[in-house]
C-alpha cells in the first residue's frame, strides 16, 4: 500500500491539506499503540509499525517537494538521496547571484522584498513541476525537483538571515 492509498487520497501532486491532516489524525487515533495495550505482543508490535508508517507517510505527503519525489518513485523515477548535479548553468548562475544578493542585504525592507522574489520563483517552479507531472514528463519533473531543492534551501537561508539580522 502506498502513502496515498494509506490516506485514501488520489495519487496527485495537488492535494487537500485539510483532508490529509484529518485522515492523519484519524489513522493516528485508530492505530495508536495505547489502543493495543491489552492486545497480544504481535498486535502491539503491528500497531507500533503501523503508527510509524502513518507518521512517515504523513511527513512525505505534507511536504510538496517530498510528495513530488514520492510520486516520481511510484512512476519509476527515484531521485531521493541522489547526488546528481544540475545541468542547467543558467539556473545555477541565478542561484549564485541570489545568494550573493542575500549576503548583501542589511535592511528589513530589502529582505522582505527579496523573500517575496524567491517565493514567486518557488511558486513558479511548483507550477512547472505540477504541469510536468500532469503531462507525464517525469524526467523534466525530476529536474524541477532538483531546482526546487535549491530554492527551498535559499528560503531557509532567508529565514536564517532574518533571525540573524532582526531576531
Predicted ranges, named:
Residues 1-167:
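C-terminal accessory/regulatory regions appended to core domains
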